[in-house]
Amino acid sequence: MNVRIKTINIKYVGGRNRFTGKFLIDRFTDLTKKGDWNKMKAMVLNKIDRLENNKKPLHLVEVSKPAPGIKEILVKILACGVCHTELDEIEGRTPPHKLPIILGHQVIGTVEKTGSDSARLKPGDRVGVAWIFRACGECKFCLEGNENLCDQFMATGRDANGGYAEYMTVSEDYAIKIPDVFSDTRAAPLLCAGAVGYRALRLTGIEDGKKLGLTGFGASGHIVLKVARHMYPNTKIFVFARNQKERLFAKELGAVWAGDTEENSPEKLDYIIDTTPAWKPIVEALKNLEKGGRLVINAIRKEDFDKDYLLKLDYSVHLWQEKEIKSVANVTRRDVGEFLELAAEIPLIPEVQEFRLEDANDALVELKDGKIRGAKVLKLN
């Protein structure tokens, strides 16, 4: 079969071993059938653009397989979750530092090869790679266990090539073993939606028997609900979601009430976790917060389209009476490890929709359009 290809230069940023290679971009999505052990397939982002303008922002390419450096591992990728953060990277709200880049930060795979001085992991181990790709390990934040706040924090799929590919490299210290109870595709969303949701739940300071609100009910929201019901069985959970399917799903999973993001909850809430990319739900959540309550914003950024809604903030209604607002910034390896142990104990099996690697654009468009029931995951190999 004749396949037209285009060659572009790319600087690979998969770890300490940095090199300049070439991407071979297939103008079709059919790659040559000839096997090449030194090549891999990947979905690559070449430029920033809104999804409304380009519904296929990622291109299927063939690229040289990376080699693990000192204390690194080569991961054969089996699954990778699809996250709202990828939309932010594609559309430029949290842009990658360099292009082209391979997105994806909810990576499940097996160790194919280890680099020199690697001792913790061995070939065949099943591991996960989360949003945290690397931190300096030496600053005050890292030394205090807050590596998520490190100024040199590197994010998987944004600052280094991620999991929308057949292989990736990562420092073995930032790869986390995956419990056997989870399949590959169901483990993937636990690394981001689950781990960051778990961190948000901890940051609320929740006590059993109090009332918890969840604003937004995508991948992270439905996992937080399951975790909260397990850890705090006497806590009533109220869900605010933008469409009827999400609200019905929340009720199926045990929410005592589910309404629109603009509705008033039937009771004041002691804690609310917001997982939306918008400002309006923040203002409405503060209105539903109990005196002395805490709102935790679980979002890497907020979009500007409804920023004017902040003008509706009224100090006496939304902020007075010692209401608190706290944000979540990234995750630590401890968050991911603790959450995976907890999820295996419950066991917490997330709802997923599977897509092929080459259909990553379709998954992203559905996510953008709000077609959500559980988590979207790319299944490879």
Task: State the predicted function of each range.
Residues W279-E351, L380-N381:
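Glycine-rich phosphate-binding loop and adjacent beta-alpha segment
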